[in-house]
C-alpha cells in the first residue's frame, strides 16, 4: 500500500475518513485507526505507463514471518530512464520504511548494475533500522535488504516493458 501510494478508508459508527498509506502506519503493530474504526477499503491509484513493480520477502519457511521484505515501484520515461522510484521495506524498523534517498539515486538513471547497487547499499546501510529477531541479526537483515533490493529492482525494471503504452 505504501509503495503504491494507496489511500485507505477507515470506517466507524461516526462515519468514514480517507488517509494516505504514509499516514496510516504509525509503528510496530500500530496504525492511525481509532479504537472504534476498522479498515474498510484500500484504493490503489492506476499505475502510469512504463511502470513496473515487485515485492520480495524472505522467510525461513513458506508462511513464516518474513525476516526482510521490499516493495519496489519504478516508472521510466520515454528514453528508458527512471522518472520515479519508491522502495519500501518491511521488518526494517518499527513499521514500513520508505527509502527515499535510495529511490532518489535511481532518478534519471538507466537500469544498470551500478545504479541498482548504489540504491541497494544506500537503503541497507543508511535508511533502514532492522531490530533483529531470534531468526536474524540486524546485520543479516541488512544483507537481506541489499540482496532483495537488487532482485526487486531488476524485476520491476523488467516489468516496465510490459506496461509500455
Regions found by a protein language model. Name each.
Residues 1-165:
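C-terminal structural segment of proteins
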Amino acid at each position: 500500500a505504501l509503495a503504491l501510494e494507496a489511500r485507505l478508508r477507515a470506517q466507524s459508527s461516526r462515519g468514514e475518513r480517507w488517509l494516505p498509506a504514509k499516514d496510516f502506519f504509525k509503528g510496530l503493530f500500530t496504525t492511525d485507526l481509532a479504537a472504534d474504526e476498522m479498515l474498510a477499503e484500500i484504493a490503489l491509484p492506476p499505475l502510469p505507463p512504463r511502470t513496473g513493480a515487485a515485492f520480495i520477502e524472505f522467510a525461513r519457511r513458506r508462511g513464516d514471518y518474513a525476516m526482510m521484505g521490499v516493495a519496489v515501484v519504478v516508472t521510466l520515461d520515454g528514453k528508458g530512464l527512471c522518472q520515479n522510484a519508491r522502495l519500501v521495506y518491511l521488518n526494517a524498523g518499527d513499521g514500513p520504511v520508505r527509502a527515499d534517498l535510495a529511490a532518489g539515486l535511481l532518478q534519471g538513471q538507466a537500469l544498470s548494475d551500478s545504479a541498482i547497487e548504489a540504491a541497494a547499499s544506500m537503503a541497507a546501510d543508511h535508511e533502514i533500522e532492522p531490530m533483529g529477531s531470534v531468526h536474524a541479526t540486524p546485520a543479516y537483515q541488512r544483507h537481506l535488504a541489499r540482496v532483495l533490493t537488487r532482485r526487486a529492482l531488476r524485476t520491476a525494471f523488467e516489468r516496465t516493458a510490459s506496461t509500455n503504452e
